Amino acid sequence: MRMSERKIIARSLSRRSALALAAASLVGAKAAHAHHGWSGFDSGQVLRLNGRIAAMTFDNPHGELRLTTAGGEWSIELAPPSRMVARGLSREMLALGTDATVEGYPHRQTARLMRAERIVVAGKTTELR
């Protein structure tokens, strides 16, 4: 292989690598923005929901509840599990069928989606933020 052919191949690989890296960066940035973009929630409107836990995840990046209320079912975004545990809220406290009160901000566009600021379970209030 001649020197000029090697340069063309090296340039081609460099361009492909650069494009692949750029594409991966954009995907990662979009995912991070989608998850961490709390601006979609209306912090000027605080809601207080009372209901029963119908489903729960206690996983990273944050826990989630499905809360059945008199007005319908809500999806509740909680804090990361490590923060909840550090503040005294365990996975066991969020068992299915448990009554809970959640205060937080509704999503501006998605109906019945809330970012929780605090949760009350069995008379214990846990600050999530």
Cite the ranges covered by each PLM segment.
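Short boundary/loop segments of OB/S1/cold-shock single-stranded nucleic-acid-binding domains
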Residues: 32-45
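OB-fold/S1-family single-stranded nucleic acid-binding modules
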Residues: 109-128
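Short, surface-exposed secondary-structure boundary micro-motifs
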Residues: 105-106
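Short aromatic-glycine-enriched beta-strand elements
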Residues: 60-67
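Short nucleic-acid-contacting surface segments enriched for D/E, G, S/T with interspersed K/R
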Residues: 86-101
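N-terminal secretory signal peptides
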Residues: 1-13, 17-28
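Structural detector for short beta-strands of small beta-barrel domains
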Residues: 46-59
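A short macromolecule-binding patch
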Residues: 72-80
